[in-house]
């Protein structure tokens, strides 16, 4: 079984021990690469942003487990040099995949801004995700945490990543393997990042549905796109 997940530290509890498990090949890569590999069928499952999961034909979502931000995100932000409502050009995180969609949906839904994509030298703002958040950029002095913006708007948790399985993958075995990895990881990992939850309960699912409604209005979902759970 071939499983892919981003290299970000907050993902560690969900893949705890998988690299050492017989019959499992674990690929840690950038979100954009994981999406491509799942679309090509070279992975059986990958941890993806919800909008990316919908870009995989007939993918199924493993319920109950994911990356959830109940409040602030800290690892996902918009850096800007103008007020958010005035952003006309934005530089995306080229490796961030569907995490860029979250920022662009918030700009459109909360601030009425639908900026075009630009290189960083001409941009009014840039989207930073994962490890890139650690870098300061004096050209964009204002930092806006995506989790905080989302929570202020909706009062709901944000589901940042879900386990997406390709069509034809061994679903029962995959659910067992991923569930056991999460149980081990949450029991044995002591340095879990504070803003992150790994359980997709009722409130998180409400947040996920709200986000996909917004993303659909903004044109970020494929036609007829809907998450299908396994």
Predicted regions and their residues:
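Domain-level signature for soluble enzymes in the chorismate/prephenate branch of the shikimate pathway
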Residues: 1-230
């Amino acid at each position: 079984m071939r499983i892919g997940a981003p290299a970000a530290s907050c993902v560690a509890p969900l893949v705890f021990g998988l690299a050492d498990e017989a019959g499992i090949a674990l690929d840690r890569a950038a979100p954009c690469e994981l999406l491509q590999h799942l679309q090509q069928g070279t992975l059986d499952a990958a941890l993806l942003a919800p909008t990316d999961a919908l870009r995989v034909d007939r993918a199924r979502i493993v319920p109950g487990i994911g990356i959830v931000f109940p409040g602030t995100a800290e690892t996902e932000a918009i850096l800007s040099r103008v007020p958010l409502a005035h952003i006309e050009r934005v530089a995306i995180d080229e490796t961030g995949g569907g995490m860029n969609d979250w920022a662009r949906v918030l700009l459109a839904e909360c601030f009425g801004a639908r900026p075009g994509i630009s290189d960083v030298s001409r941009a009014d703002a840039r989207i930073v995700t994962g490890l890139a958040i650690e870098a300061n950029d004096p050209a964009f002095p204002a930092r806006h945490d995506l989790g905080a913006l989302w929570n202020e708007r909706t009062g709901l948790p944000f589901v940042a990543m879900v386990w997406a399985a390709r069509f034809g993958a061994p679903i029962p075995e995959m659910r067992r393997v991923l569930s056991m990895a999460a149980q081990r990881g949450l029991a044995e990992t002591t340095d879990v990042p504070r803003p992150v939850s790994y359980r997709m309960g009722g409130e998180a699912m409400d947040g996920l549905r709200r986000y996909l409604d917004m993303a659909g209005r903004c044109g970020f979902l494929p036609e007829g796109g809907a998450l299908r759970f396994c």
